Amino acid sequence: MQVHHNFFISMQKPKSQSSKPVGKRRAEDNPGLYLHIPFCEIKCRYCDFFSVTELSRITDFLDAICREMNLRGKVFKFFDTLYIGGGTPSVLRPDQLNRLLEHLHQHFTISKEAEITLEANPADISVSVMKELHSLGINRLNIGVQSFDNRILEFLGRRHNGRQAIQAIEASLQAGFGNFGIDLIYGIPGQKRNTWIKTLEQALTFQIPHLSCYQLTVEPETPLGQSYKKGLILTPDNDELFELFMDTSEFLEKAGYCHYEVSNFARGDSRISRHNSKYWHHIPYLGLGPSAHSFDGEKRWMNVRSLEDYIQRLNQGKLPMEFCENLTREELQLEALFLGFRTSAGIDLDDFEEKFGWNLWSVKERDYELLLDAGHLKIVNGRLQPTRTGMALADSLALL
Amino acid sequence: MDHIRNFSIIAHIDHGKSTLADRLIQFTGISDERTFKDQMLDNMDIERERGITIKSQAITLPYQAKDGKTYSLNLIDTPGHVDFSYEVSRALASCEGVLLLIDAAQGVQAQTVANLYLAMEHNLEIIPVINKIDLPSADVERVIEQIDDELGLDSEGHLKCSAKAGIGIQDILEAIVKRVPPPRGNPEAPLAALIFDAHYDPFRGTIIHCRIMEGTVKSGDTIRFMSNSATYRVEEVGHFLLQREKRNCLSAGEVGYIIAGVKTVSDVRTGDTITLDDRPCSQPLPGFREVKPVVFASIYPIASDDYDDLKAALEKYQLNDASFIYQKDSSAALGQGFRCGFLGLLHLEVVQERLEREYDQSIILSVPSVRYRFTLKDGSVVYVDNPAHYPGSSSIELSEEPYIRATLMLPERYLGAVMKLCMEKRGVNSTLNYPSPGRVELLYEMPLAEVIYDFYDRFKSVTQGYGSFDYELIDYRESQLVLLDILVNGERVDALSQIVHRDRARARGLQACERLKEEIPRQMFKIAIQGAIGGEIISRTTITPFRKDVIAKCYGGDISRKRKLLEKQKKGKKRMKMIGQVSIPQSAFLSVLKSDAD
């Protein structure tokens, strides 16, 4: 299955052939590597990421993902971000993580300055374990706090409480993680605006480097989605969600965070999630593990969304790919737009023209002018950037 | 001729007309199971979906009766909507008898009665057939009573069947043979053939469907259309079996087709009489009427690049629909398009659907209008069927609008509600008749414009489907007319303009604004919708913008899914028309004519 031999070539080609100074090539244009650890102790009610609760399958899974590395490692070489997500990667013991990382280093080159992030559940975090992880080379944590409010945590079906969330943050700091982020969820049925702002205030007391504030999305294939379908819960309406979105952004920017993506806030540019930014800037990524997606600049493919299939295929020496699509220029264009408008950096008009062969601004000038007037867009240094209200309309902006 | 029977099936909608037709076809064995497609006579997808027949169709069924003789039974199917009542009358004029089909569970309904009256007008033998007798809810006794009391027929001769289950089919065929009189006419007389339909065949040109009343026609004859004296040389004549079957000649009493090098269907007029050029009959058959469109609307391509495609599609479409006319038109808001004439609103909707489905066109239809008559101050008279050509109130001396005489048949219990509706629709000079106990016939004169403006839907709704309705144009009458414009974000959308009665203007303006508010999706900007007469704003609504559409999470695994969703939205957007920066969906243009259902 020779599908991705051009991972590197394809992303470098347009740059090296362009008349632009080589200096414009940025370090973050290197691909990112993602590992999907598909295990959770319990499933949260709202989450539709792929994971299973049969922790007894971890060993077989580790064998399988190492096999996948063997197969992919022959083609892919260099990465400068690594993100271990899931699932709940923190259900792995440090020695298991160690095995994973060692195998990874044998098959891939990870930059010395790489950002290496591990997603962790607050209940799994202790100073000693975090120290161990730090020594393995993990230099960034993303902690699934979601809320400090026990009632909300219970509603979401989380296995930690508010106290554990706070302890996890303190333990991470103590263990030496200067760089870490927490996830928070808002727009929860019954949650008052004040409750949410209080959650943010609580987070601020720790001067957390990175905050992901997600509006609750009710996914149909989840227990929460089922409750919604039965009419058991009432979600805030679109206007309320918009107000909450604006409040969140204003509140955090006032507190010194930059709102650099729809749901992401960093305490200074150096604290942004370098790995996740690759998705939004359309930079290639390789995903390993069941249900993981990969993108080489032209193709996107997805691994099977079943742990047993995944293990079985790799046992047979086959790549566990479920689907692969060749992206047309039009598809890439649309992606570049809706991803770009998600970020405060927006879309570099020159880059866009170089990549797609037409000038975005001159074609859509009439629409964009109106949006500039309406305060949804701005132009900064040749970049078309969404304002705060524009970010909330990223999809519509992309469809103009 | 003694072995020919010409008949039609008439019924209320959904009483099983097409199913019975299928069963008769199957029984006579001209179609085997393998080639059989349900509802053979409803050829168009739309006909099958809506359950209504739009074009007439004919088929000849060879049937060996119990008397040992073989008969040719000509089944002539009829369209089932008031827009096409003239076509129905021509089809019935080609028959000697009808099967009046009644649903055993639903009993006699509005169209049963309306169709019965049409058949009686033509002095046809009427055979009542009770269908669906196998349904658990069937109440045959009640239907028999209704046949006697409500229809005033003799229920003695009724037949029972289940077309679906194939029960009682042979009895029906026998009754057709025994009770429908054989056609009369003299094969040696000068030719007189009644055209009841025509369709277009890409290889042979127009296929004329006709009933030979007198005389004989064969290939090589030169025929003449009596309405316009056009002459053609007959290439082929024959019968309709499952396909066309060539015959040497068609003689008095027969139903069949004539191919005579007629280029388009619009050269043929339904109801016209065909005779021989060298030996014409003395006078045309009665009942011919020039069919004129009464409802007008403009059609525009959604993308202006598709204009040529649309033009080609209309040309092709017209080959098969003689009652559809069109000419070039242009709109400030919607660009190049065509002004089209239709028999009624249903006809308009059928044309719209067929252009979209069969010809793959994405189109916008402007607000439908009738044809108004204005006498200007300089003494000249202009007919205006397009609000864009409204002469301007200062130059008008006299405004007139077309009136119709509406004939409404309904159970007495709905009389109050229907009279109220008719008055609301500016109906005048009402007459009330009681053709049978419990049933009333109500005649009203009212403006045609009120009828195209949702009258039919509301009439059906207030009579719970038991009312039937027919109309004929009578004359033009003086009226107070004004031009109602619609502005979207300050921009006048000429395709939404309407000519309306002054007293109705404000209500219509409000209604149009409300409808558009429902139809136009919220967008990133505030959209103001205004109704205006002259320079004066008479109504106004605002569509508030939506402010957030972005999803919370978009990481590596979400991008493809998200893209596909957006591609879908983009496709939907392409089907909308951009007026300035506002995307207006197709449905909005017709919606302004719809009012709130009571």
Curated annotation (Swiss-Prot), chain B:
Belongs to the TRAFAC class translation factor GTPase superfamily. Classic translation factor GTPase family. LepA subfamily. Residues 2-184 form the tr-type G domain. Gene3D superfamilies: 3.30.70.240, Elongation factor 4, C-terminal domain, Elongation Factor G (Translational Gtpase), domain 3, P-loop containing nucleotide triphosphate hydrolases, Translation factors. It holds the Pfam family LepA_C. HAMAP family: LepA (MF_00071). Its EC number is 3.6.5.n1. The keyword Hydrolase applies. GO terms for cellular component: plasma membrane. Keywords: Cell inner membrane, Cell membrane, GTP-binding, Hydrolase, Membrane, Nucleotide-binding, Protein biosynthesis. This is Elongation factor 4. It is found in: Cell inner membrane. Its main location: membrane. Required for accurate and efficient protein synthesis under certain stress conditions. May act as a fidelity factor of the translation reaction, by catalyzing a one-codon backward translocation of tRNAs on improperly translocated ribosomes. Back-translocation proceeds from a post-translocation (POST) complex to a pre-translocation (PRE) complex, thus giving elongation factor G a second chance to translocate the tRNAs correctly. Binds to ribosomes in a GTP-dependent manner.
